Amino acid sequence: MENSHINESILSEEILEDQKKNRIDHMTYLPGMEDIGSDVMDQVISAMNAYDYEKYTEVDVRRAIAHDIRTPEDFAALLSPAALPLLEEIAQAAQAETRKHFGNSVYMFTPIYIANYCENYCIYCGFNCHNKINRAQLNEEEIEKEMAAIAKTGLQEILILTGESRSKSTVEYIGNACKIARKYFKVIGLEIYPVNSDEYAFLHECGADYVTVFQETYNSDKYETLHLAGHKRIFPYRVNAQERAVKGGMRGVGFGALLGLDDFRKDAFATGYHAYLLQRKYPHAEIAFSCPRLRPIINNDRINPMDVHEPQLLQVVCAYRLFMPFASITVSTRECARVRDNLVNIAATKISAGVSTGIGSHVDDIEDKGDDQFEISDERSVDEVYDALLKNNLQPVMSDYIYV
C-alpha cells in the first residue's frame, strides 16, 4: 500500500531537494548510538517479510481462536482478512482472555507534553522540524505546576512526552521531570526519543518505570521515505530501543506501529512478534501495546488511515490480546469516545483521560504554550472517563503499585 497522500510534502521543492542530497543511510548507526548486537530485529523483519496473510483460511482462524496458548502462526491467522468475518467470535474470545487476567480493571493515566521541539523530519507528524508550529518547552517550575494540577484529578500514573530533540530536551532535563513526577505519581512512563541503555538506566534511577517507543512502521523501505532527516531516520536504533530500555532496568516497555502508514496487517504482525521475542528473551519485562491510527496534523489535514477502519482496529487489538494475554493494551485519544469505550470493554486495559497534546495545557498561567502534536477525538475529562467505565461495569484503577 503506497498511501501517496502521506508522501505529499508540505515543504517547498527546494527544501526537499536539499534534504535528498544530504540524506543519511537509514540502516547505519550514527556516532554515539549504542549497538547492543541483538538479533531480534533481524528475526522480526524476516518473519514480517515472510508473512503472507492471504494464505490463511477460516479453518486457520478458528483453530487460533480455539487454542489456549496462541503461537505466532495463530497470531498471523488472527490478523488475516479471513479473520474479519469471524470478528465477533474473536472479540468474545479476547474479552474472555481479558477478564481472566485483568478482571474488570481498566487503568487510567494521562500524558503530559513538556516540550515539542524536534530535530526529525517525519512527514506525517505535527512536531516535525519543518512544520511551522508554536514551539515551547516547560521549565521545572512549569512542569511542577502542570503535574500538581493533573494530580488533583486523582490520577496516579503519568506519561511524560517530548519532541525528539536531544539538544532541547536533554536526558538530564527529562530526568529532572521524572524526579518531579515522582512527588505526585506512583507510575511514570516515558515517550521520548530513543537513548542508549546507560541513559535509560539514568532515567530509571530518576523515577521512570516504563518506556514506550513507536516504531511507526517495520517496513524499512517505507520507513526511509517517511523519516527524511534526524536521528529518528536510523531504523535499527529505533527498533532496538525497547531492548536497550530493558537492559537499562526499565520495568516495562511498550510497542506500537502507527496503523495506516503502511500495510497495517504486516505492521501489526511485526509489532506483536517483536514484543513476543522480547518477552521470551526477558521474561521479567512487562509488555504493553498501543494501537494508534493516523490522524490529521497542523498544516496537513489530508493525513488519514485510509484502509484501517474500526473493524480492522478491533481485529488488531483482539489479536494482540489473544497472542499476548498478559500485555497491557492502550487505546489512544486519536479514537472517539465510542470506539475507546467499546475497546476497553473487550480487550484494552488502559485508557487516557483529560488529554491534551499541547504544551502547558493543564494550567492557565503558563504563557508560552506550544501547539498540539495531532488532533484528538476523545476530549473527556478524568471524571467523565471514570464514570463511563463504571457505567460499563468496569473498575477504574489509578495504580496497583506500592513503592516501599
Region roles according to the model:
Residues 94, 122, 160, 213, ...:
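Conserved, mostly hydrophobic/aromatic
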Residues 196-205, 262-276, 336-346:
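Catalytic cores of alpha/beta
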Residues 1-83, 280-404:
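Auxiliary Fe-S-binding modules of radical SAM enzymes
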Residues 69-106:
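An N-cap/entry alpha-helix motif that binds or orients negatively charged groups
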Residues 102-103, 107-142:
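Canonical Radical SAM [4Fe-4S] cluster-binding loop centered on the CxxxCxxC motif
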Residues 129-144, 150-246, 251-255, 259-261, ...:
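Core AdoMet radical
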Residues 116, 164-169, 259-264, 298, ...:
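Short, small-residue-enriched loops and turns at beta-alpha junctions
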Residues 95, 110, 147, 174-178, ...:
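Generic structural signal for well-ordered alpha-helices
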